[in-house]
Each structure stands twice: as structure tokens, then as C-alpha cells.
Amino acid sequence: NTKELDFVRFSPNNLANKWKLMFYLNTSKVILVDNYYPELAAVSFKDGVECIQLWHANGALKQFGWEDNSISERSDADKKRFKAVYEHFLKVVVGSDEMGEIFKRSFLLNESHLLKIGVPRTDVYFEESLQQQKRIEWRNKFHAENKKVILYAPTFRDNELAEAKLVMDFNAMERAFSEDYLLVLKLHPAVKIDVQSLNTDFIINVDKNVALEELLAAVDILITDYSSIPFEFALFERPIYFFSYDMEKYDKERGLIKNYQEIIPGPISQTTAELIEQIKTKTTSETLALFSKKWNKYSDGHASERMVVYMKQLMEEAK
């Protein structure tokens, strides 16, 4: 019943809502977060309060938390805040043993912190009728007709807060694929770049605020790099290509997970020409199903149900 819910849109510039947020953080029995929130560092939870980290992805190719290479450049005050926030995560929801190990290293947690119930955000992909509906809906919006849809969704890079530069040669992609494909461009909401000039009969720029789970059902081929999208898209078992043009630089500055090249379920390219050749020759990995099974081990379409059961148990114990 939404009438029983109090939606507070948090904004650093909205003092009233900020105070409201802090009130709820200090009075709630169960707190769900899906990212790093510095506000947690300012809260001292009472006994019995459980903060559960849902996270915003069911897998990781880039390092984060204490594993992030840039952590060495942060101040002692920053590190103290990180520690305070991470220590509030009493449970972390995971969809696989692999992701559990990453969380343990990234947040300095142990096995008892892991809630192996599957990732709730993946439940939607198991609703076949809904996915078919979304596929038809978005293909109609794209005017795809008899064409296949390629989605290019690069990961966010820290320097793109000021200005981003797209390395992909879109003219070459159009010459190679415009007869049989459409190229859909989906950038991170924080990226600042003018892409209106890229809108053509071949290239479609999707609003940055459109949720990815809305689009994936309509996608036939995914192109990305270090994003977590492949872990969800792999549930469809459709081809994935990795346009990792700055792999060495990114690994040095931010950090990729160990054995990145062996883990990903598709070929790597560092130039648009290589990428085009890979797509044309269909040199996709044969391990998509194994990759999905491994990283979505506990995600079976019922993770949200198990999450609700767990939360109800916590609330009952609080009575």
C-alpha cells in the first residue's frame, strides 16, 4: 500500500529532506541501501538495527571499496569515513559465491555477512511475458522492424564528470552494420557529452535516465567494457562484446578484477575495426550459459520473495 510509504527524494541542497533522511536512518529497524552512502558514517545504529546492502549490480568487473586502486590517493579522513560506512553493512545480498568473495575483499567482511538469496533486481528477467512485452515495446520505439539491435553501454569513467569523449568510430559502425542493425547508445547518467549529433537512422541515443532493465529484452548484441551489465544480460544468453580500448590505463588507475580477460564471456577489442570484425565473424564466447550460471547461482526469479521473508523475520524479532 503506497499510502503507507513516505517517499523522500534526497538532495544535498534540500535541508528538510536531509534531516528527514537522518531521522529515518536513526529510527528504522531495517535499512536497505544499494550503493555507498556517506550519510551512514554519521549514524550510530542502536542494537538490533540491520543495514542490508543490496548493491546495484549482480557482478563486478571493476574494483571498488578497499580494492579500488585510487584508494591510496584518498585522505585519512576519507578512509575513516569509508570504514565507518562499510562497517554498517551487517548483511550484503549476493547472487553468487564469486560476488560474495568480491564483497568480502572490498568491504572487509566475512562469510557471516553474506545473504545468499539471489539479487532482487534480477527477478524481472525471469518474467517471460513481461520480457516479451518489453522487447516488442522497445523495438517499436526504435522502429527496428526486421533489424537487430546492438546496445553500446560503456562504463562510467571518473574524468567524464567534466567532459566525455566517445572513442568508438560510429561512422565505421554505420558503414558496417546499418543494413541489418540499429545501434542504441546508452550512457551513464553522470556523463556529460552532447550526443544529439549522433542521432541518425542507424544510431539511437536513449535517454540517460531510462533504466537498463527496461531495454535489455530488446537487445540482440551487447557492447560494453567494464560495466556490470553483462552479468544481467547473460541471463538472455545473447552475444556480448567488450570494447576495452583503454584496458591497461583503466586497470592502472581504477583497477579491474583479477583475470578480467579470462572471466568475461566474450572477445575483447581495442579498436573499432577489431570490434567490427569480431561481430561480423560472430567470434562470441561459447561460455555464456556457464558464465550466467556461475554469477547468477542464487538468482532464480524469487530473490525478492526471499528478501521479504528475511525482512519479516527481522521485524518479528524486533517486537
Which stretches of residues belong to each language-model region?
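Short active-site oxyanion
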Residues: 29, 87-92, 182-183, 218-221, ...
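Donor nucleotide-activated moiety binding/catalytic core segment of transferases
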Residues: 15-28, 189-231
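Catalytic binding pocket for nucleotide-activated donors in carbohydrate/polymer assembly enzymes
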Residues: 198, 228-295
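Conserved catalytic-core segment of nucleotide-activated headgroup transferases in glycan assembly
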Residues: 106, 114-197, 269, 303-305
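Active-site and donor-binding regions of nucleotide-sugar-utilizing enzymes
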Residues: 1-129
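Helix N-cap/beta->alpha junction signal
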Residues: 35, 95-98, 189, 226, ...
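C-terminal amphipathic helix plus adjacent low-complexity
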Residues: 130, 272-319
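A donor-sugar binding/catalytic signature common to diverse glycosyltransferases
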Residues: 31-45, 50-55, 209-254
